[in-house]
Curated annotation (Swiss-Prot):
Low complexity bias: start-end ranges: 156-166, 206-215
Top-rank taxon: Eukaryota
Underlying gene: SMN1
Native source organism of the sequence: Pongo abelii (Sumatran orangutan)
Residue ranges of every copy of the Tudor domain listed in the record: 91-151
Protein name, per record: Survival motor neuron protein
Renumbered residue ranges of the record's region P1 (binding site for GEMIN2): 13-44
Record-listed Phosphothreonine modification sites: T25, T69, T85
Keyword Ubl conjugation appears in the UniProt entry: yes
Entry keyword set: Acetylation, Cell projection, Cytoplasm, Isopeptide bond, mRNA processing, mRNA splicing, Neurogenesis, Nucleus, Phosphoprotein, RNA-binding, Ubl conjugation
Cross-link (Glycyl lysine isopeptide (Lys-Gly) (interchain with G-Cter in SUMO2)): K51, K209
Length: 294
């Protein structure tokens, strides 16, 4: 009996120690699993030390700069600079050719001075060949460049040709029998120094984005072909007429307008083929009814 009591007495404290140790560690794990107080304190300490270092550095830099700032030279040089700028402003006259920076894209285009306000040191320029009027500072005007003007005029002409080609292709897509093999849109060889010129008001090609554009609503899908009154179509027709593919889009100028144009062209072609198929099926039904009556 003594041995059994001694054994049970010696075993109880071991079990109690084990249980107490497990409960303690379990509670501490559950309570500290989402506790990030130490991390927040470390972050705040690092930010505070960084701000303190920056503040001390700024004070040192400002004090160093104040000691080493050079003295200004006499105002004679400033007067000479003012004379040079005044002379450069006075050289422009109404009707002079120049090159100006268009505010829409920040590129240089040839222009002509329409009016000058010497008090405000501004002028109104008209971009050559396009009619866009814009107010510019006289100090911002550049000397005219003949080669740039020629390239801009040539690009504008090719730009108009591309817009004409796009309208021709949209008309050809409405007539099933026309072929578009002979229509080849020209790729505008833009100068690497300049983007396309600014556009005229209205639906035209935008500056800096060469290629075909799709402005306005899509063309309405054509109606299905009329019923052949007394003609019986063969049971296996040759298929729908050839539709010209949508105009190519330059991969360098892909944007929302290009994606929208491609979607509208696909929608238009899908509507045409759907109408053709529905008309063909209706012709087949009418032909079968006429044969059954006969």
């Amino acid at each position: 009996m003594a041995m059994s009591s001694g054994g049970s007495g010696s075993g109880v404290p071991e079990q109690e120690d084990a249980v107490l140790f497990r409960r303690g560690t379990g509670q501490s794990d559950d309570s500290d699993i989402w506790d990030d107080t130490a991390l927040i304190k470390a972050y705040d300490k690092a930010v505070a030390s960084f701000k303190h270092a920056l503040k001390n550095g700024d004070i040192c830099e400002t004090s160093g700069k104040s000691k080493t700032t050079p003295k200004r030279k006499p105002a004679k040089k400033n007067k000479s600079q003012k004379k040079n700028t005044a002379a450069s402003l006075q050289q422009w006259k109404v009707g002079d050719k120049c090159s100006a920076i268009w505010s829409e894209d920040g590129c240089i285009y040839p222009a002509t001075i329409a009016s000058i306000d010497f008090k405000r040191e501004t002028c109104v320029v008209v971009y050559t060949g396009y009619g866009n009027r814009e107010e510019q500072n006289l100090s911002d005007l550049l000397s005219p460049i003949c080669e740039v003007a020629n390239n801009i005029e040539q690009n504008a002409q090719e730009n108009e040709n591309e817009s004409q080609v796009s309208t021709d292709e949209s008309e050809n897509s409405r007539s099933p029998g026309n072929k578009s093999d002979n229509i080849k849109p020209k790729s505008a060889p833009w100068n690497s120094f300049l983007p396309p010129p600014p556009p005229m008001p209205g639906p035209r090609l935008g500056p800096g984005k060469p290629g075909l554009k799709f402005n306005g609503p899509p063309p309405p899908p054509p109606p299905p072909p009329p019923h052949l009154l007394s003609c019986w179509l063969p049971p296996f027709p040759s298929g729908p007429p050839i539709i010209p593919p949508p105009p190519p889009i330059c991969p360098d100028s892909l944007d929302d307008a290009d994606a929208l144009g491609s979607m509208l062209i696909s929608w238009y072609m899908s509507g045409y083929h759907t109408g053709y198929y529905m008309g063909f099926r209706q012709n087949q039904k009418e032909g079968r009814c006429s044969h059954s009556l006969n």
